């Protein structure tokens, strides 16, 4: 996503959220369960496992993983890859969120890149909000 900031700002907050991160019980249909069992057997050589092992892998081990990266005027200013479904990249002249660099001049062209590593479900909802003041 690219936005041209219309003036110089003192503070910038980039918020990204998505859901769900993990499968919910209502997401796992009999067809999906069979697909996952067949896939794990074929790709990873995993044979039959106990129902408890399968549930732990599906409901806790598998996850949607989406990170965010930002540049300002084609210069890297931050990257967030925390295991949270809502995260902020916050910038001022003297402070910034961990993984980000303080920005004394918040102006110009802001680019936010959504880095998708894994998405469990089609139509995963997400929201990107940019606030400047």
Q: What spans do the regions from the language model cover?
A:
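Acidic, Ser/Thr/Pro
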Residues: 1-133
């Amino acid at each position: 996503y690219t936005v041209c900031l219309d003036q110089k700002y003192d503070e910038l907050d980039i918020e990204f959220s998505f859901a769900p991160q993990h499968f919910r019980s209502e997401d796992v249909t009999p067809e999906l369960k069979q697909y996952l069992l067949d896939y794990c057997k074929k790709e990873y050589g995993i044979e039959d496992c106990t129902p408890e092992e399968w549930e732990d892998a599906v409901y806790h081990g598998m996850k949607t993983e989406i990170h965010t990266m930002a540049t300002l005027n084609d210069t890297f200013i931050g990257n967030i890859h925390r295991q949270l479904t809502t995260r902020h990249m916050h910038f001022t002249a003297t402070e910034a969120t961990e993984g980000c660099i303080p920005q004394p001049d918040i102006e110009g062209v802001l680019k936010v890149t959504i880095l998708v590593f894994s998405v469990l479900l089609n139509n995963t909802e997400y929201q990107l909000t940019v606030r400047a003041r």
